[in-house]
C-alpha cells in the first residue's frame, strides 16, 4: 500500500490519576503495553502504543495522571504529561465518571484550551453508574469546554471502544505510518519488562506501599537455549518498605517473581529466569537518572 493511501494520527490520552488510561491503551491495542493497577500514578513516562486498522495507524500516547507535584519525580511526571500535547492531532480527555468533580479536571481543561488541539471527551466506567449520572457528568464537562465529540465507554469491559476507534480513523489525516506494521509500542524492552514487575508489586501490595518505588531492569542476557536472564532492582525509600516487599521468609518477593515471570513468558513467548533484588535508596525520587533511568 502506497503511503499516499495511508492515514496516521497521534492521540494523547490525558486525565486524572486512575481514570483508566492504561487499561484503555491496552484494550485499544489488544495487548498489554502499560501497567494497570488500582494504585494512583503508575504511569510515569510517555509511551506510544500503536494500533493499525486497515490503512490507518493510530498512535496513542499513554500519559501520567495529572496531579499536584511535590518531589522532583512528581514534577518530572507532570512535565512529561503536558509535553504529550505537543505535535499531536487529538487530545482525548478520559474521565472517570464516578469522579467527574475531581479538583484537577479544570486545570487539565485549561491546559487543553491553551494547546488549541482537537479535544475529545471519553467518559469511562459507565458500567458502574446510572445513565443519569453519566448525563450529569457530560453536562458538567461541557460547561467547562466545548468538546468536538463525546464517547461513553467501559475500557475494562470493552464497551464503546469500536465507535471511538472508527471516529479516530475517520478524522486521521493522510500521511505515512510512523511505526512499522506489527510494532505495538515504542517502549524499550528493559522498560517494558520493568513495568510488568512494577504492576505485580502494586497489585500485591498497593494497600501497604506508596507509589514511591521503582523497578529497574539492570541486565538482560540471552542464554544459548534461547531463554532470557532478567535481573531487576526494586528501589524503595525506607527499610520497612524493603521488609514488606520481601515478606515473611521471602514469600512475598517469591510470589511477585513468579507472577511477573509467568506473565513475561506469556507475552514474550520465551523462557524467563527472573532475579529480583530490593535496595533502599532514600529520596531516590530526586536522583532520577541514577537509579530510575528516566531521561528528559
Swiss-Prot record:
Domain KH type-2, first and last residues per copy: 205-282
Binding site for GTP: 15-22, 62-66, 124-127
Location of the protein in the cell: Cytoplasm; Cell inner membrane
Segments of this protein annotated with the region G4: 124-127
Region spans: G2: 41-45
CDD domains membership: Era, KH-II_Era
Positions of region (G3): 62-65
Membrane topology designation: Peripheral membrane protein
Keywords (A to Z) from UniProt: Cell inner membrane, Cell membrane, Cytoplasm, GTP-binding, Membrane, Nucleotide-binding, Ribosome biogenesis, RNA-binding, rRNA-binding
Broad class of where this protein is predominantly found: cytoplasm
GO MF entry, a single one: ribosomal small subunit binding
Region (G5): 153-155
Domain Era-type G positions: 7-174
GO biological process, one term: ribosomal small subunit assembly
Stretch list, region G1: 15-22
Family label: Belongs to the TRAFAC class TrmE-Era-EngA-EngB-Septin-like GTPase superfamily. Era GTPase family.
HAMAP family attached to this UniProt entry: GTPase_Era
Chain's role: An essential GTPase that binds both GDP and GTP, with rapid nucleotide exchange. Plays a role in 16S rRNA processing and 30S ribosomal subunit biogenesis and possibly also in cell cycle regulation and energy metabolism.
Subunit structure: Monomer.
Name of this chain's protein: GTPase Era
Organism: Ehrlichia canis (strain Jake)
Lineage: Bacteria, Pseudomonadati, Pseudomonadota, Alphaproteobacteria, Rickettsiales
Name of the gene encoding the protein in the UniProt record: era
Amino acid at each position: 500500500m502506497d503511503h499516499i493511501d495511508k492515514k496516521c494520527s497521534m492521540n494523547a490520552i490525558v486525565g486524572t490519576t486512575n481514570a483508566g488510561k492504561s487499561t484503555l491503551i491496552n484494550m485499544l491495542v489488544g495487548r498489554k503495553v502499560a501497567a494497570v493497577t488500582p494504585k494512583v500514578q503508575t504511569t510515569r513516562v510517555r509511551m506510544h502504543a500503536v494500533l493499525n486498522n486497515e490503512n490507518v495507524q493510530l498512535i496513542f500516547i499513554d500519559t501520567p495522571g495529572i496531579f499536584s507535584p511535590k518531589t522532583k519525580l512528581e514534577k518530572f511526571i507532570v512535565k512529561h504529561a503536558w509535553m504529550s500535547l505537543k505535535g499531536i492531532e487529538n487530545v482525548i480527555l478520559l474521565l472517570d465518571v464516578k469522579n467527574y468533580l475531581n479538583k484537577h479536571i479544570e486545570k487539565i481543561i485549561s491546559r487543553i484550551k491553551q494547546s488549541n488541539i482537537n479535544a475529545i471527551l471519553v467518559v469511562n466506567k459507565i458500567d458502574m453508574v446510572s445513565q443519569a449520572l453519566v448525563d450529569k457528568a457530560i453536562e458538567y464537562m461541557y460547561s467547562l469546554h466545548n468538546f468536538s465529540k463525546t464517547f461513553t465507554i467501559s475500557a475494562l469491559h470493552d464497551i464503546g471502544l469500536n465507535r471511538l476507534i472508527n471516529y479516530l480513523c475517520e478524522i486521521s489525516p493522510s500521511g505515512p505510518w510512523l511505526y512499522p506494521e506489527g510494532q505495538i509500542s515504542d517502549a524499550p524492552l528493559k522498560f517494558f519488562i520493568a513495568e510488568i514487575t512494577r504492576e505485580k508489586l502494586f497489585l500485591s501490595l498497593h494497600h501497604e506501599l506508596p507509589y514511591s518505588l521503582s523497578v529497574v531492569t539492570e541486565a538482560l542476557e540471552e542464554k544459548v537455549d534461547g531463554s532470557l536472564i532478567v535481573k531487576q532492582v526494586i528501589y524503595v525509600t525506607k527499610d520497612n518498605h524493603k521488609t514488606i516487599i520481601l515478606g515473611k521468609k521471602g514469600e512475598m518477593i517469591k510470589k511477585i517473581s513468579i507472577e511477573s515471570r509467568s506473565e513475561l513468558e506469556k507475552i514474550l513467548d520465551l523462557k524467563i529466569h527472573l532475579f529480583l533484588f530490593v535496595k533502599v535508596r532514600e529520596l531516590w525520587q530526586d536522583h532520577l537518572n541514577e537509579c530510575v533511568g528516566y531521561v528528559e
